[in-house]
Design a protein with these regions (language model features):
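Bacterial Sec-dependent N-terminal signal peptides
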Residues: 1-23
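Alpha-helical transmembrane segments and their juxtamembrane interfaces
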Residues: 12-13, 171, 214
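Residues in and immediately flanking transmembrane alpha helices
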Residues: 15-16, 174, 217
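Hydrophobic alpha-helical bundle signature of multipass membrane enzymes
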Residues: 24-197, 221, 228, 239-241
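Alpha-helical transmembrane segments that form the membrane-embedded catalytic/substrate-binding core
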Residues: 161-165, 198-235
């Protein structure tokens, strides 16, 4: 277990040296209306008087404790980056191949379209519940205060970062199953970073993983997605043989 976590942390630290480029507008495989409806398949966020919310509060203070670990805090700060390019660069090392538009055009195209598609699954619930974020409720800055003003106007439930991160590792694990354990461990860590930063409650992150899984299942009903996935797998085999 210790060796496994060491490899994950090594991947995280190495990735920080990979350059991040500007995002591009891309088409999606489905519209928001065609994606799974979180209001129908997941419960509402915990009521503030519930035991579940007490757990959220406990995890918030756990996150603040984790900030005392300078290495983990630095990872959480980096993970605050919303860009697709950051996610691709961060997961390139556990994936085993540098994911860029130039080096892996088919994988890059697939990931980009998937990312913008899965983004849609959480939008309706965010607007409907408009849940207050932890740093807002406790009236103190998050670990990444430059985002606080914008985030305070955007619902906390579910975690959009977690939806992006978890769906990405699901896809990369399908392309390279041999690295699935390490990829999933990094994807899990990516979601926990949102708790450490103080941008999300634990239940936001948990819901984000479930929403990402539902969105990923929906992607597999798209012929265009399946065709591009086939190209991405072929590209990976060619690059790693």
């Amino acid at each position: 277990m210790k060796r496994h976590m060491f490899l994950v942390l090594l991947c995280v630290c190495f990735c920080s040296s990979i350059s991040i480029k500007a995002q591009e507008k891309v088409s999606t495989y489905f519209t928001q209306e065609e994606m799974p409806d979180m209001l129908k398949f997941l419960p509402a966020p915990p009521d503030t008087l519930s035991e579940a919310f007490s757990h959220d509060v406990m995890r918030y203070f756990w996150g603040k404790q984790m900030r005392q670990d300078s290495v983990r805090a630095a990872i959480a700060l980096r993970d605050a980056d919303w860009s697709a390019e950051y996610i691709f660069s961060e997961f390139s090392v556990p994936f085993g191949l540098n994911i860029t538009k130039e080096n892996t055009p088919e994988i890059y195209k697939l990931l980009t379209q998937c990312l913008y598609t899965v983004d849609l699954v959480g939008k309706k619930a965010k607007a409907f519940y408009n849940r207050k974020r932890p740093f807002d409720r406790f009236k103190e800055p998050s670990l990444y205060p430059k985002d606080d003003e914008a985030l305070s106007k955007n619902g906390s439930y579910p975690s959009g970062h977690t939806i992006r991160g978890w769906s990405t590792v699901l896809l990369l694990s399908e392309i390279n199953p041999e690295r699935a354990d390490t990829l999933l461990a990094r994807g899990y860590m990516y979601g926990e970073s949102r708790v450490i930063v103080g941008a999300h409650w634990q239940s936001d992150v948990d819901a984000g993983r479930l929403a990402a899984t539902a969105a990923y299942m929906k992607l597999h009903t798209s012929d265009a997605f399946l065709e591009q996935l086939k190209k991405a797998k072929a590209e990976f085999r060619k690059k790693t043989k």
